[in-house]
Amino acid sequence: MKSRWIAASAAACALALLVVPWMLRPGAASKSPGTPAGAHKSEGAANLDLTLKDMNGNAVRLADYKGKVILLNVWATWCGPCELEIPELVETYAKYKDQGVVVLGISLDDTAEMLRDYAPKKQMNYPILLMQDDFDEAYGPIFGVPVTFFIGRDGTISRRHFGPVSREQVDREIKALL
């Protein structure tokens, strides 16, 4: 009986060693089950026809930023890595805004009230927008945060970065798009 349990455990571990890397391959998270290949591309044309609400309830059209380099950062107040990258994003926006770069924070938080209290405490100098269901349709499902999209002036996603971004990564991506 014990040897069967050991054999079953070994088989499960071997299967996990094969399946997990396959699931974590680049581009795997950009597709949801039942979605045709390429429907949620990590690179390619961004859907700028999306309208989201800001912390004050105002509608913000992403199309209004066409012609600018867009750093689109999906985050949440309860996310530790997101909180750590906020100073990087604040500095990035201050450094590049006069060169036609905009940083947009897309928050997964439930209420705008939460953000109106949080953003000033973190000295967030860039627009904060609220996540809506149609974001997933436009950019693919978000399975974890932070996720950062780098979008060129022509509206093309040049990179989708999962996890926190460093200052060096942001500078490299933005300079390539300027």
Which residues make up each language-model segment?
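N-terminal targeting signals for export/organelle localization
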Residues: 1-49
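Hydrophobic beta-strand core positions in alpha/beta domains
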Residues: 71-73, 105, 149-150
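Conserved hydrophobic/aromatic "anchor" residues
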Residues: 50, 65, 74-75, 118, ...
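Structural microenvironment flanking redox-active thiols in thiol-disulfide oxidoreductases
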Residues: 83-122, 131-138
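Conserved redox-active cysteine motifs that mediate thiol-disulfide chemistry
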Residues: 66, 74-91
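A short beta-strand-turn-helix
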Residues: 42-44, 49-70, 93-96, 139
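Thiol/disulfide oxidoreductase modules built on the thioredoxin-like
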Residues: 117-125, 130-177
